Amino acid sequence: MRQIAFYGKGGIGKSTTQQNTMAAMAEMGRRVMIVGCDPKADSTRLILHSKAQTSVIQLAAEKGSVEDLELDEVLVEGQWGIKCVESGGPEPGVGCAGRGVITSITYLEEAGAYENLDFVTYDVLGDVVCGGFAMPIRQGKAQEIYIVTSGEMMAMYAANNIARGVLKYAHSGGVRLGGLICNSRNTDREDELIIELARRLNTQMIHFIPRNNVVQHAELRRMTVIEYDPENSQANEYRQLAKKIDENDMKTIPTPISMDELEELLIEFGIMEQEDESIIGQKANATVA
């Protein structure tokens, strides 16, 4: 069994990418379980055709404790037999959402949820690299990390930060970076930029997912593209990504870069302009003058 985690900046399309890729993986005959590690509990909605799966934390609150739960209450089977679990989190502003991740994974292990599987995937809130959300990395639950990014500055900044988190636990926990997934935003020279970022991080761009409106059309129906329009070229992109992950033997210890290096890379590719130190702190009317 391989345990992999998808990390990435909020709003990058991480959950959508993960669900479509795992749908393709299940279509290939792999036995898959998705564990949502995001308080939004939206990591399984396209597989289950639901708004949000009832989370382990919600069910535990209703029952009194996690120990009172039955596995079939928290684990729901969706399309292609994909097993789905949402860890959930507390009400906004109260408590630590990362605790929900820790509680859920511990419960699933003790309840025998990991038996007879080929892949377990963790869909993790990515720009908050706190202890709870880093738990799949920190305790060696996820051995392979895939970072969903794009050619936008903040997505790349988050990817570099996540690489730092992987590096921190690479020697103690054995976690490795499996690659960057570029979920295209149609920015200039995007594929070249992410290939170069991957090179500097000592990894690969494992796949470039082109932008396609069919993804949004499928999401409106709470479906993966694999199910909604299986003959669409975008469905084949996710199938290619699933095959690449299934066959991936490039798992590395990342080499995160400094903020200065990241900015230099963005300037080199024309994403950022070279700063003119003389204009820093100047108001609009002063610059015009």
From Swiss-Prot:
EC number assigned by the record = 1.18.6.1
Per its Swiss-Prot or TrEMBL entry, what cofactor is needed? [4Fe-4S] cluster
Name of protein: Nitrogenase iron protein
Residues annotated as binding [4Fe-4S] cluster? C96, C130
Query: What are the BP-aspect GO terms?
Result: nitrogen fixation
PROSITE patterns the record matches: NIFH_FRXC_1 (PS00746), NIFH_FRXC_2 (PS00692), NIFH_FRXC_3 (PS51026)
The catalysed reaction is: N2 + 8 reduced [2Fe-2S]-[ferredoxin] + 16 ATP + 16 H2O = H2 + 8 oxidized [2Fe-2S]-[ferredoxin] + 2 NH4(+) + 16 ADP + 16 phosphate + 6 H(+)
Family classification: Belongs to the NifH/BchL/ChlL family.
Q: How is it modified after translation?
A: The reversible ADP-ribosylation of Arg-99 inactivates the nitrogenase reductase and regulates nitrogenase activity.
Its job? The key enzymatic reactions in nitrogen fixation are catalyzed by the nitrogenase complex, which has 2 components: the iron protein and the molybdenum-iron protein.
Check the record and name the Gene3D superfamilies matching this protein: P-loop containing nucleotide triphosphate hydrolases
Record-level Gene Ontology MF annotations? 4 iron, 4 sulfur cluster binding; ATP binding; metal ion binding; nitrogenase activity
Q: In the UniProt record, does the keyword Cell membrane occur?
A: no
Report the source organism: Parafrankia sp. (strain EAN1pec)
Please state what class of enzyme this protein is.
Answer: oxidoreductase
Q: Which residues bind ATP?
A: G8, K9, G10, G11, I12, G13, K14, S15
Q: Which residues carry this modification: ADP-ribosylarginine?
A: R99
Outline the subunit composition. Answer: Homodimer.
Keyword annotations: 4Fe-4S, ADP-ribosylation, ATP-binding, Iron, Iron-sulfur, Metal-binding, Nitrogen fixation, Nucleotide-binding, Oxidoreductase
Bound cofactor: record note? Binds 1 [4Fe-4S] cluster per dimer.
